[in-house]
């Protein structure tokens, strides 16, 4: 399972002209699910993301988590995180999970984030989405449950 985590001052997802999820201060999480992923990867990433100390404290040091600052999470499914462009110029998505399994694990990840007491807004799985954000910093962290980067 792969994520791109961005610290934001606000973010939203629009599907077919309607906002499906929006947050103010918090984290935008783009989530990709791989073929071999299981619930344990979702649990690991939810724990890691909820505890990431990437918000500044009173001394302007990154020392606070999204929980500490009372922020929220906007989780957006993004299978293209498994795009492989090592051969040719068109990405291959063979390493991405099948849509049915990916949806299960995406929803499980969202449930795990919510179980940590965080408000978690979402996009719409498999929909064409327009993601709008104001990146705060910018601060962007890449996480992979298989620790590949």
Curated annotation (Swiss-Prot):
What Enzyme Commission number(s) does the record list for this chain? 3.1.1.96
Q: Keyword set for this entry? A: Cytoplasm, Hydrolase, RNA-binding, tRNA-binding
Source superkingdom:
Bacteria
Q: Which GO terms describe its molecular function?
A: D-tyrosyl-tRNA(Tyr) deacylase activity; Gly-tRNA(Ala) deacylase activity; Ser(Gly)-tRNA(Ala) hydrolase activity; tRNA binding
User: Which reaction(s) does its UniProt entry say it catalyses?
Assistant: glycyl-tRNA(Ala) + H2O = tRNA(Ala) + glycine + H(+); a D-aminoacyl-tRNA + H2O = a tRNA + a D-alpha-amino acid + H(+)
Q: What class of enzyme is it?
A: hydrolase
Q: Where in the cell is it found?
A: Cytoplasm
> What Gene Ontology terms for biological process does this UniProt record contain?
D-amino acid catabolic process
A GO cellular component term found in this entry reads: cytoplasm
Q: Where is this motif: Gly-cisPro motif, important for rejection of L-amino acids?
A: 137-138
**Keyword match Hydrolase:** yes
**Gene3D superfamilies attached here?**
D-tyrosyl-tRNA(Tyr) deacylase (3.50.80.10)
What's this protein's function?
A: An aminoacyl-tRNA editing enzyme that deacylates mischarged D-aminoacyl-tRNAs. Also deacylates mischarged glycyl-tRNA(Ala), protecting cells against glycine mischarging by AlaRS. Acts via tRNA-based rather than protein-based catalysis; rejects L-amino acids rather than detecting D-amino acids in the active site. By recycling D-aminoacyl-tRNA to D-amino acids and free tRNA molecules, this enzyme counteracts the toxicity associated with the formation of D-aminoacyl-tRNA entities in vivo and helps enforce protein L-homochirality.
Among NCBIfam families, the record links this protein to: D-aminoacyl-tRNA deacylase
Family from the record: Belongs to the DTD family.
What does the entry's free-text domain comment contain? A Gly-cisPro motif from one monomer fits into the active site of the other monomer to allow specific chiral rejection of L-amino acids.
Subunit info here reads: Homodimer.
Protein name listed in UniProt: D-aminoacyl-tRNA deacylase
Organism, by scientific name, is Koribacter versatilis (strain Ellin345)
Query: Source taxonomy lineage?
Result: Bacteria, Pseudomonadati, Acidobacteriota, Terriglobia, Terriglobales
């Amino acid at each position: 399972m792969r994520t791109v985590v961005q610290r934001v001052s606000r973010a939203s997802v629009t599907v077919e002209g309607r906002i499906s999820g929006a947050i103010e201060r918090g984290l935008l999480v783009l989530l990709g699910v791989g073929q071999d992923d299981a619930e344990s990867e979702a649990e690991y990433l939810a724990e890691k993301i909820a505890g990431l100390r990437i918000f500044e404290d009173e001394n302007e040091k990154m020392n606070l988590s999204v929980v500490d600052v009372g922020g929220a999470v906007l989780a957006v499914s993004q299978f293209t995180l498994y795009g492989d462009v090592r051969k040719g110029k068109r990405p291959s998505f063979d390493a991405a999970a099948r849509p049915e399994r990916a949806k299960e694990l995406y929803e499980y990840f969202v449930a795990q984030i919510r179980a940590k007491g965080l408000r978690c807004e979402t996009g719409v799985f498999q929909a064409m989405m327009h993601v709008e954000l104001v990146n705060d910093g910018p601060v962007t962290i890449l996480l992979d449950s298989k620790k590949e980067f």
